[in-house]
Amino acid sequence: DLWQFGQMILKETGKIPFPYYGAYGCYCGWGGRGGKPKAGTDRCCYVHDCCYGKLTSCPKTDDRYSYSWLDGTIVCGEDDPCKELCECDKKIAVCFRENLGTYNKKYRYHLKSCKKADKPC
């Protein structure tokens, strides 16, 4: 669910998720707007959208899953029916951390150059 997802992002990046990533670039935020991803951070969101699109179990983004932290690493519950969803959220949280250096405030609320998707997943 969004709360769990936000907690992963906060712990991985130290950033409060909504103001930082809620409307960033062409893909960060509810349902990407399309176009070419804006640098690494926005690419994380593009990949996350694709990951959600490929879910075969627990396709609702508001479903809860089990996860824990082990030595600073997110571990998704092995037998959880929503493990795929957890793995998608884990990947983007880690991607955000790895791409903190690509974050550019000029891409917040940046809609002008975002068009229909031109990159298939």
From Swiss-Prot:
Localization of this protein: Secreted
Entry keyword annotation includes Secreted: yes
Enzyme class, broadest EC rank: hydrolase
CDD domains listed in its UniProt record: PLA2c (cd00125)
Phylogenetic lineage: Eukaryota, Metazoa, Chordata, Craniata, Vertebrata
Protein name as catalogued: Basic phospholipase A2 BmjeTX-I
Reactions performed catalytically: a 1,2-diacyl-sn-glycero-3-phosphocholine + H2O = a 1-acyl-sn-glycero-3-phosphocholine + a fatty acid + H(+)
InterPro entries: PLipase_A2 (IPR001211), PLipase_A2_Asp_AS (IPR033112), PLipase_A2_dom (IPR016090), PLipase_A2_dom_sf (IPR036444), PLipase_A2_His_AS (IPR033113)
Cofactor(s) listed in the protein's UniProt record: Ca(2+)
Disulfide-bond pairs as recorded: 26-114, 28-45, 44-95, 50-121, 51-88, 58-82, 76-86
An example Gene Ontology biological process: venom-mediated edema in another organism
Job description of the protein: Snake venom phospholipase A2 (PLA2) that induces a slight blockade of neuromuscular contraction in an indirectly stimulated chick biventer cervicis nerve-muscle preparation. Does not inhibit contraction of chick biventer cervicic nerve-muscle preparation in response to treatment with acetylcholine or KCl. The neuromuscular blockade is mediated by inhibitory action at the presynaptic motor nerve endings. Lyses skeletal myoblasts and myotubes in vitro, and intramuscular injection causes local muscle necrosis. Induces edema in the mouse foot pad. Induces a transient increase of IL-6 levels.
Cellular compartments per GO CC: extracellular region
Binding site for Ca(2+): 27, 29, 31, 49
Main location group: secreted
Pfam family, one: Phospholip_A2_1
PROSITE patterns named among the record's database cross-references: PA2_ASP (PS00119), PA2_HIS (PS00118)
EC number per UniProt: 3.1.1.4
SMART domains membership: PA2c (SM00085)
Positions of the catalytic residues: 48, 89
Co-factor binding details: Binds 1 Ca(2+) ion.
Tissues showing expression: Expressed by the venom gland.
One MF annotation (Gene Ontology) recorded for this entry: calcium ion binding
Family: Belongs to the phospholipase A2 family. Group II subfamily. D49 sub-subfamily.
Source organism superkingdom: Eukaryota
